[in-house]
Amino acid sequence: MAIKSYKPTTPSRRFYTNVENNDITSKPSVRSLLVKLPASAGRNNNGRITSRHREAGAKKLYRIIDFKRDKFGIAGTVSTVEYDPYRNCRIALITYVDGEKRYILLPKGLNVGDAIIADATGVDIKPGNAMKLMNIPVGTSVHNIELKVGKGGQMVRSAGTSAQIMGRDGKYVSLRMPSSEMRLVLGECMATVGAVGNEEYINIVLGKAGRTRHMGIRPQTRGSAMNPIDHPHGGGEGKTNSGRHPVTPWGKPTKGSKTRRKKASDKLIITRRKSNPKR
C-alpha cells in the first residue's frame, strides 16, 4: 500500500492524502458480525458531557473482532480483506473448515487465500497464527497481546505496530512494546505472530477540518480565548499570556505533568517508556 495524493481542485483537497485501498476485497461484510453501537457523543447516562470535543461522527457499524483467538486446532482461510471504520488497520474475514466465520486484525504479509491457525500448544511461526507467548521464539514480532489469560488481546492492535519478544523469566515473557517500554506478560497469554498491517496509516494527512468531524472529533477552543469564568487562562486585554503554568479547565497541571496512578501491575514494567525530550 502507498499514500495517495489528489489534485488540488479545492483548497481542502490540496494537502488531502489517503492510503490506497487496492488490498480491500469488494465484497459485502458479514451481517451477523455487524452491530450498531449507540453514539454517546461524550455524554453520560444523565446527558452531561463527560468527555469534551466528541460527537457522533459519520454513521458506521461495528465489526465484531475475534481478539481472543480461542478457536484452537481448526484451520481457517482468509476470505476477504475489509475496511473497518472503527480502527486504523484492515480486518480479515476468516472462514474456518467447520463453516464458522470470524474477523481478525489483518497482519502485515497476510493475503486472501492464506491459511492460518490458532493453538495453545504452538503452531508454525508465520503471520496470522496465534499461540501462547511461552511457545513463541525469542526475537519474534507479535501483536494483539493479552494482559489477562483468556480475556482477549488488549495491547499492540494499532496499524503498523508490533512488540518483540526479548526473553523469558520463569512464568513470564519479557516484551519490548512499540513505545520502547519493557514489560513482563504471563507466558500463558495469547498473542498473534507478525505486525499489524496498514503501516502507512501514520503518514496520512487529514487535509481538512471536515475529515476530523467525520471521525467524531469536535473543534477545541483555546483556554486563552475564553473568559475568566470559563478557563483559568481566560481574560485579559487582547492577546495575553495566561500568567501561570498551563492547567486544565479545572486547574490541574497539564502539558507534561504525570497523572498516571500507581498500580499493582507496575512491578511488571521493567523499563518505562521514553518521555518526550521536548517537555
UniProtKB/Swiss-Prot annotation:
One of its GO terms (cellular component) is large ribosomal subunit. GO terms for biological process: cytoplasmic translation. The keyword Ribosomal protein applies. Belongs to the universal ribosomal protein uL2 family. Residues 255-279 have a biased composition (Basic residues). Keywords: Ribonucleoprotein, Ribosomal protein, RNA-binding, rRNA-binding. Transmembrane segments: none annotated. GO terms for molecular function: rRNA binding; structural constituent of ribosome; transferase activity. Part of the 50S ribosomal subunit. Forms a bridge to the 30S subunit in the 70S ribosome. It comes from Sulfurimonas denitrificans (strain ATCC 33889 / DSM 1251) (Thiomicrospira denitrificans (strain ATCC 33889 / DSM 1251)). One of the primary rRNA binding proteins. Required for association of the 30S and 50S subunits to form the 70S ribosome, for tRNA binding and peptide bond formation. It has been suggested to have peptidyltransferase activity; this is somewhat controversial. Makes several contacts with the 16S rRNA in the 70S ribosome. Residues 218-279 are annotated as: Disordered. This is Large ribosomal subunit protein uL2.
